[in-house]
Amino acid sequence: MPTIIPLLQKVRSGLPFRIGPRPSGPDYQITPRYRVAFLTGCIQDELFRGVNADTVSVLARNGCEVIIPEHQKCCGALHAHVGERELSRQLARSNIAAFEATGADYYIVNASGCGATLKDYAHLLHDDPKYSQRAAQFVAKLRDFAEFLVEVGFEAPAGRIEARVTYQDACHMKHGQKVFLQPRVLLKSIPGLELVEMKDSDWCCGSAGIYNVVQPVMANEVLSWKVENVSNTKASILVASNPGCTIQINFGMEKAGQPLEILHLAEILERSYRLAEEAPA
C-alpha cells in the first residue's frame, strides 16, 4: 500500500469530489422502523461526503435510525487487491466488532467495492475459530443501499427530474453482489426521469479497484469502450454507485470533451425528495 499512495495523490486534480461535512442525523423528525449501521468508507468519506450525507438522509426518510459506528475501519478492499490478505483479515475483525456493538438490525454500505468486500468476510475469516461465525452473522445483516430500500419498501420520491439518465453497473455490484435490478427500480420511481440502458452497462470501466492506478494504459483502453457506450445513450446524467467508477468515468468523459453529471443513486433520490419539498403548495 505505501507504494500506491503517491500514485493516488497524482490523480486527485480534476476529479468530481463532493467534500463537505461528515453526515450526521437528518434535520427533520422521523419515526424509525429500522435501526441501521452505516459504513462510511474511506474514499467515499474523504472525497464524496455529500454522497454519504444524502445516503443518511434517504435512509432516514424511509424510516431508519442511522448509526455511524465510531470505530469502523477501512473495509480492506484495497489491501486485498495488493495481496495484503492478513491486514485485510485484521480490518474485517475490527469492523465486525464495531458493527456488532451498535445492535443494529441491518448494516448498510453505499459503495459497491466496499460492499463486495464486506460480503466476503465470511469467506475471508472462514478458518478463524473466534470470528468465523460472527463473520457469517455480519454478512447476514449486510445490505447494499439500493438492495435494502427495495427489500424493506421505500417511499417513492415525488420531485420531478426531467432528465435522460443512464446507469453504470459496477463490476463489484452486479457480478460481486448480484445487485442490478434494485437500482433500476429506484430510478424508475422518480417522476419525469427517463432511464436509458447503455450497451454493456456491466462491462468494467477500467477502475477495477486500483487497476487504473497501477496499469493506467490498459485501464484507459477499457475506459474508452465505456466512454463510447455512455456517450451513445445521449444521457445528461450518469448514475453510479461506486466512487472508483465515478472517478474513472468522469476522467474519461472530460478527456473526450463530453462532460456529464455523475451522481450516486442516493444523490439523485435525495434531489427528487427535496424538489418535492421545495415545490410551491
Task: Label each region the model flagged.
Residues 1-281:
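Iron-sulfur cluster-binding electron-transfer modules in prokaryotic oxidoreductases
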